[in-house]
């Protein structure tokens, strides 16, 4: 098949089409701190919920990922992982959210939620965009069969735990409102690294989804976020916090000890600069009118 419609490329082009208006008068040194689910973070910049880093990079990469988050006070999101790996990451010291796959064996979902509760994770999430393979049939991941989540199942998942439940893979007002009505307390706008071609860029979907919700809940964004300017664009358009994924993998590969922490701190500096230059001096003052779409 011809490689067309790559959603990562489309998302990158969309990000680059968003321009930033400066507003210097009455601005001040910005405060980018964030309170999320009762915890305070130095920045709304988070890690993405990556999986199988030891397989994709080198043995110990997942530990380096968790350590990089802990050393910078960054909220750590983790994707598919065994309980021991999750515990090892949590022991590094970062606040942590685990994203759980839509296992056809639903008991496994509940088991993972109970484990997350037992080790003190900040929240748990469900990957709703991972049930199907390339032929539209059930996806198979590491020997596990996946299946689509129903709204009734999502209600049961939300009611079974005291942890906030987040849904990852939302790109429509339909999924957003269905999830919120089921009791979800956070949404991740993401096309999951080109799960489907020609997907709407998350920042294109963000304003409409935010406007459609009657309840104010955290909205997270991932996909092609690379710089503090990218982060700012997402925040200005209504995101609560923003995840970075593949650039952190590259940073770890280049420098396993300090690459990730250095990258995160540099992106924070870029975000502070952009907030100062636009008069958005804290996260509550983010203003979508400073973003202009270059046609």
Language model segments and positions:
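Short, charged beta->alpha transition segments
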Residues: 27-38, 77-89, 112
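A gly/proline- and charged-residue-enriched helix-loop-helix capping module
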Residues: 69-106
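Charged C-terminal helix
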Residues: 269-295
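Short glycine-enriched loops at secondary-structure junctions
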Residues: 52-53, 79-85, 129-130, 173
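C-terminal helical cap(s) of enzyme catalytic domains, especially alpha/beta-barrels
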Residues: 8, 140, 199-212, 250-275
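Alpha/beta enzyme core
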Residues: 66-67, 71, 91-92, 104-221, ...
């Amino acid at each position: 098949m011809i490689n067309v419609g790559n959603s990562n490329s489309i998302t990158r082009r969309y990000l680059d089409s968003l321009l930033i208006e400066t507003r210097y008068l009455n601005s001040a040194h910005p405060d980018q701190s964030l309170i999320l689910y009762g915890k305070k973070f130095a920045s709304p910049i988070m890690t993405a919920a990556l999986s199988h880093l030891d397989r994709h990079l080198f043995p110990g990469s997942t530990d380096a990922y968790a350590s990089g988050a802990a050393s910078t006070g960054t909220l750590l999101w983790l994707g598919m992982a065994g309980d021991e790996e999750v515990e090892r990451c949590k022991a590094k010291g970062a606040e942590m959210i685990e994203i759980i796959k839509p296992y056809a064996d639903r008991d496994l979902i509940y088991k993972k939620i109970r484990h997350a509760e037992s080790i003190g994770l900040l929240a748990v999430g469900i990957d709703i965009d991972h049930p199907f393979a390339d032929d539209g049939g059930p996806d198979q991941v590491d020997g596990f069969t996946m299946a689509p989540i129903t709204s009734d199942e999502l209600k049961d998942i939300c009611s079974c735990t005291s942890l906030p439940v987040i849904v990852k893979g939302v790109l429509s007002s339909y999924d957003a409102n269905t999830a919120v009505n089921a009791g979800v307390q956070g949404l991740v706008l993401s096309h999951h690294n080109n799960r489907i071609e020609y997907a709407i860029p998350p920042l294109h979907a963000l304003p409409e989804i935010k406007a459609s919700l009657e309840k104010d809940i955290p909205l997270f964004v991932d996909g092609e976020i690379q710089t503090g300017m990218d982060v700012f664009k997402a925040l200005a358009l209504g995101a609560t916090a923003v995840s970075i994924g593949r650039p952190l993998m590259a940073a770890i590969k280049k420098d396993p000890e300090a690459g990730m922490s250095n990258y995160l701190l540099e992106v924070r500096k870029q975000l502070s600069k952009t907030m100062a230059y636009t008069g958005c001096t804290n996260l509550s003052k983010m203003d979508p009118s400073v973003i202009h779409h270059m046609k």
